[in-house]
Regions:
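Hydrophobic residues within alpha-helical transmembrane segments
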Residues: 31, 95, 99, 137-140, ...
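Hydrophobic transmembrane alpha-helices of multi-pass small-molecule transporters
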Residues: 1-60, 64, 177-304, 403-404, ...
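Membrane-embedded alpha-helical segments and adjacent helix-loop junctions characteristic
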Residues: 34, 38-130, 274-279, 283-354
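Transmembrane alpha-helix interface/packing and boundary motifs in multi-pass membrane proteins
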Residues: 14-23, 99-109, 140-151, 238-244, ...
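Alpha-helix N-cap/start motif
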Residues: 44, 90, 131, 172, ...
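Juxtamembrane and boundary regions of transmembrane helices in multi-pass small-molecule transporters
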Residues: 6, 91, 127-140, 145-158, ...
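C-terminal ends of transmembrane helices
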Residues: 12-21, 67-85, 121-126, 193-194, ...
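Hydrophobic alpha-helical transmembrane segments
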Residues: 1, 173-186, 317-329
Length: 423
């Protein structure tokens, strides 16, 4: 069997298992990596290169920095302060989505949701508001906020890695040029028209969950909470001014993480616990698959096939619409990170074949992969509110599908202006 055939079969295998999740995503990714080595498609050095990638090092550092923000209770306090100013259900939706979106722009989407879910449940219980109308906007905002910065979501860094491999790059806030408008429009949507699509389940009819009991952070010293916030802010500032200060962004992350552990703001055990190993293995494994797609020509073959279906005279707008639609559809039936991991190398090949700006195609792919609102399986946070909100699958479709369409339209308008496919 030829290397290109092996790579295409492995890609199909990964897609099927990513969708069905018959095996954990990390296991599927590693099966693909090991198979590429055993069949000789990739050398061990090329296959495992993703595990010493700069962005994977940044993942580890930011997991620890985010973990300190969560473990000290600073994230909980931040959410509680903001939501105190909301006096009606719609005002609370705006407050919850705003704080969630901003936090998830720099922290783990799942971690942000996990911290704010009990805060929102507590407020709903005290005020008599239906938690079912608050929890879906919360997780949707977590996904939207992930596009505010380079470190907001794992897929963003996958895009950066892919661009760096071809000598290009993307700035710290460039995803936010499209991500912020989507978040603002999303908040406005659920405060107005979208409010009607949110399920209104009577208090008490929602499911029980582990989030019903809020964590007690009263024993955590105030200096630890302040330190976690200050170090996180300073780390982000250092990343933004990477070129000016001469320290690579991943090293700034490492310095911040080391300071937090060394000063005892977060214990070594808590630091290890905060690292999401699945993300690291999926990242490393899918980078190997991306390398195989490039090396064997399988990626170029897929790109040529897509272009063949579009026609040789396809307009840039048509190409954008197709790339964005493919990302949107796939991300609602498999992990948003897995969608980005699979589509980014293919998108790069499409851009090369059509002579389009690779950054434009990558940004479209990453943004589309974040619009995982229409099903409970698009991202982990979606499933986290399933029981406490008392939701059904159709609740996600009814509230989330309109938001997917809104996000798609906003992207179609902004991407050609901010990231044109052709200059």
């Amino acid at each position: 069997m030829t290397p290109i055939s092996i790579t295409l079969l492995l890609l199909l295998f990964v897609i099927i298992l990513f969708i069905t999740e018959k095996l954990p995503l990390a296991v599927t990714s590693m099966i693909a990596l090991i198979t590429l080595v055993l069949t000789g498609v990739l050398s061990p050095k090329d296959a495992f290169a993703g595990f010493v990638d700069n962005n994977l090092i940044l993942f580890v550092a930011m997991f620890i920095i985010g973990g300190a923000f969560f473990e000290t209770g600073m994230a909980n306090k931040t959410g509680g302060i903001v939501t105190k100013f909301a006096h009606s259900e719609r005002e609370l939706i705006v407050a919850v989505m705003t704080v969630t979106g901003l936090m998830s722009g720099f922290l783990s989407n799942t971690g942000t949701a996990a911290v704010l879910i009990p805060v929102v449940i507590g407020i709903a219980a005290k005020s008599g508001f239906a938690r079912s109308r608050l929890l879906l906007p919360l997780i949707f905002a977590a996904a939207m906020g992930g596009n505010l910065s380079l470190i907001g979501a794992p897929g963003n860094l996958l895009g950066k890695s892919a661009l760096q491999a071809i000598g290009a790059d993307i700035g710290f806030f460039e995803y936010g040029y499209v991500g912020l408008p989507i978040l603002v429009v999303g908040i406005a949507f659920f405060a107005t028209v979208g409010y009607k699509f949110l399920p209104n389940k009577k208090p008490g009819s929602e499911g029980e969950s582990v989030y019903d009991e809020a964590q007690d952070f009263s024993s955590v010293p105030a200096w630890k909470q302040k330190a976690s916030l200050i170090i996180m802010v300073l780390t982000i500032i250092a990343m933004i001014f990477e070129k000016q200060i001469g320290i690579k962004f991943y090293l700034s992350g490492c310095i911040g993480a080391i300071i937090l552990v060394a000063t005892g703001v977060i214990s070594e055990k808590q630091a290890y616990k905060s690292i999401d190993l699945q993300t690291l293995f999926v990242y490393g494994g899918t980078l190997a698959l991306a390398k195989a797609l490039e090396k064997t020509g399988a990626g170029a073959y897929i790109a040529d096939s897509v272009i063949g279906l579009l026609g040789s005279n396809a307009s840039p707008f048509m190409l954008l619409a197709v790339v964005l639609l493919l990302s949107c559809v796939m991300t609602n039936f498999m992990s948003n990170f897995a969608t980005a991991a699979l589509l980014i190398p293919i998108s790069l090949n499409i851009s090369a074949a059509m002579g389009a700006d690779p950054k434009a195609v990558i940004v479209a792919t990453v943004i589309g992969s974040s619009l995982a609102f229409a099903t409970p399986i698009g991202m982990p946070a979606n499933m986290m509110v399933f029981a406490p909100g008392g939701y059904t699958f159709n609740d996600y479709v009814k509230a989330g599908l309109p938001m997917v369409i809104v996000g798609y339209i906003v992207s179609l308008i902004l991407l050609p202006i901010l990231f044109p496919f052709y200059h």
